[in-house]
Swiss-Prot record:
Name of the protein described by the UniProt record: Probable glycolate oxidase iron-sulfur subunit
Binding-site positions, [4Fe-4S] cluster 2: 36, 78, 81, 84
Record key words, sorted: 4Fe-4S, Cell membrane, Electron transport, Iron, Iron-sulfur, Membrane, Metal-binding, Oxidoreductase, Repeat, Transport
Presence of the UniProt keyword Transport in the record: yes
Cofactor: [4Fe-4S] cluster
Gene: glcF
Subunit details: The glycolate oxidase likely consists of several subunits including GlcD and GlcF.
Free-text comment on the cofactor: Binds 2 [4Fe-4S] clusters.
Reported function: Component of a complex that catalyzes the oxidation of glycolate to glyoxylate. Is also able to oxidize D-lactate ((R)-lactate). Does not link directly to O(2), and 2,6-dichloroindophenol (DCIP) and phenazine methosulfate (PMS) can act as artificial electron acceptors in vitro, but the physiological molecule that functions as primary electron acceptor during glycolate oxidation is unknown.
Known EC number: 1.1.99.14
């Protein structure tokens, strides 16, 4: 429970740090309401809408209300999907307001011992250190390959876990071997004439748990005519930190990544995870008040592109792409790829170019799936409501292949498939893996 002293400090910092001009930009028109999943799934509660949350932020900053548990609950229930931003006639940067508010609350509130341990372990000891990430993911691999997973499942021990965690265990990808995660290339030449020289942002989860997808992305870029530089000094993007009130750690990771990429002579910096790419894209905002880093951040941001944009730019979709077996395919937008990186047409263009892939657009493909980083772990009830609505839209397309471009979305869609009893009938894949399959190559 937040104390009076803590609430007073939070209120003072809202007044000092929240962007008054941005808060006032909200005209309360309500254009954002139909795009907000939590507003809809909460039964149209105003406090769970972008407009309502901005009103609460403004009221706290003006001293009209205290930043009590109700305010904190409203802000924590937001997915941060930012679907409200493209439809806002005033161009309110809602995501930036939300992250600032969450950071203020986190920095000034006393957390339970369990939460402090969890945050320190995940945000400070694990994600920023790639060697530790590899070790942690290797333990999951050991669990999967040693026979322990089979024994645990047969014993019924998983029944002690909440249902969503049992299902999550069932949909975890097969983890790569430790040696494959350790030995990563620093340079890969184009296959055929070189058209672009690019750098690749590997990510932390993407280069461990989802390593085959990173390998697929690299192979696609090579086939499209890219020389690829992969700087080993790069780090976690900091997205989970920024979204969870760990802004200072996010800034340090941003500086490490800018330093790793800025000296490279490349045409673009490529990402293949919507959540990572979106946070990288906003490094200029994150470091805008730092005189040493603001210009460097702005220069870095200018080079960022999703891999799908580069593939279309290099006419990869004109290649002979085909599936061995004709399949109905649908696409679930990564919220941050669509709403922050403004990349939605290119993935569809690539999918529609695959022979044997009958593309069917699902209803509200641009609406969040409920993953939202760690939201599906900390806000289970709302996340599953949103997922159930999403799976109803998927089933209406009769697709047997759900494609997305973000690891969190991918796991969430696999979770939805498992919950709906569609395992073995429907599969979820990352766009890069499907494209490599369609190009006649195996994902390694």
């Amino acid at each position: 429970m937040t104390t009076e002293k803590e609430m007073k400090q939070i209120q003072n910092e809202f007044k000092e740090r929240m962007d008054e001009g941005e808060l006032l930009n909200c005209m309360r028109c309500g254009f954002c309401l139909p795009s907000c999943p939590t507003y809809i799934e909460s039964g149209f509660q105003e406090t769970h809408s972008p407009r309502g949350r901005i009103a609460l932020m403004k009221a706290v900053a003006d001293g009209m209300i205290e930043p009590d548990e109700d305010v904190e609950r409203s802000l924590s229930l937001c997915l941060g999907c930012r679907a409200c931003e493209p439809v806002c006639p005033s161009g309110v940067k809602y995501g930036q307001l939300l992250e600032e508010a969450r950071d203020i609350i986190h920095q000034n509130k006393k957390h339970s011992l369990g939460e402090r341990v969890m945050r320190k372990t995940a945000f400070h000891e694990l994600f920023p250190h790639q060697n530790r990430m590899r070790s942690a993911v290797s333990l999951i691999g050991l669990y999967q390959r040693s026979g322990l997973q089979t024994a645990v499942r047969k014993s019924g021990m998983l029944r002690v876990l909440p249902e969503h965690l049992r299902t999550m265990e069932a949909v975890l990808p097969d983890v790569p071997k430790s040696k494959d995660m350790k030995h990563r290339p620093r340079f890969l030449p184009s296959i055929g004439p070189m058209k672009k020289r690019v750098a690749f942002f590997s990510g932390c989860l993407m280069d461990t748990m989802f390593l085959p997808t990173n390998n697929a992305t690299l192979k696609l870029l090579q086939l499209a005519g890219c020389d690829i530089v992969i700087p080993p000094e790069q780090a976690c993007c900091g997205a989970l930190h920024g979204h969870s009130g760990e802004k200072n750690t996010g800034k340090e990771l941003a500086k490490q990544n800018i330093a790793a990429f800025e000296a490279l002579d490349v045409d673009a910096v490529i990402t293949n995870a919507g959540g990572c790419g979106a946070f990288l894209t906003e490094y200029d905002h994150l470091l805008k008040d730092d005189p040493e880093w603001s210009e460097r951040a702005a220069a870095f941001v200018q080079k960022l592109k999703d891999f799908s944009s580069v593939l279309v730019e290099l006419d990869f979709h004109q290649m002979d792409l085909a599936l061995e077996t004709p399949q109905v395919v649908t696409y679930q937008d990564s919220c941050h790829l669509r709403n922050v990186m403004h990349t939605s047409l290119e993935p569809r263009q690539l999918l529609k170019s695959i022979k044997g892939a009958e593309f069917k657009e699902m209803e509200k493909a641009d609406s969040c799936c409920g993953s939202a980083g760690i939201y599906n772990i900390v806000e289970v009830e709302m996340s599953m409501k949103i997922l159930d609505s999403k799976m109803a839209a998927v089933k209406a397309t009769e697709a047997i292949l759900i494609v997305t471009a973000n690891p969190g979305c991918l796991l969430q869609m696999k979770l939805g498939i498992e919950r709906e009893g569609l395992s073995g009938k429907v599969r979820a894949v990352h766009l890069a893996d499907l494209l490599l399959e369609a190009a006649g190559h195996k994902t390694s």
